[in-house]
A protein has these predicted regions:
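Long, contiguous binding/interaction regions
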Residues: 2-105
């Protein structure tokens, strides 16, 4: 059975800018299939990527984020793998609110 991959990183960059940059980095190697923001503190991403591109994706993200260490796979497999990435924004205040409009009726 193929194991999922769990990564975590953090950044001091502006949250909005960082999310856009991280999305561009991921889109070069794989696809974001789900995401969950946690106020302005962090965001969790579910990424699908070919196993042969995982090391490249990690290197690109590690060039942008402070990432935990990862043992390289050195794989040439085209099998799809799932990566769970949690990004913490170091300058967050925890006060982000998402306004939900009232629906009449």
């Amino acid at each position: 059975m193929v194991q999922n991959i769990f990564w975590s990183g953090f950044t001091n960059r502006d949250r909005t800018t960082a999310i856009a940059d991280i999305e561009m980095i991921i889109n070069q190697s794989g696809f974001i299939i789900d995401f969950k923001p946690f106020s302005d503190i962090s965001i969790s991403l579910v990424i699908e990527v070919q196993e042969s591109h995982i090391d490249q994706l990690y290197d690109a993200l590690a060039g942008y984020l402070h990432m935990e260490d990862f043992d390289r796979l050195h794989s040439v497999s085209s099998q799809e793998r799932t990566i769970y990435l949690n990004v913490t924004f170091a300058n967050a205040m925890g006060k982000l609110r998402n306004e939900i409009p009232a629906v009449p009726g």
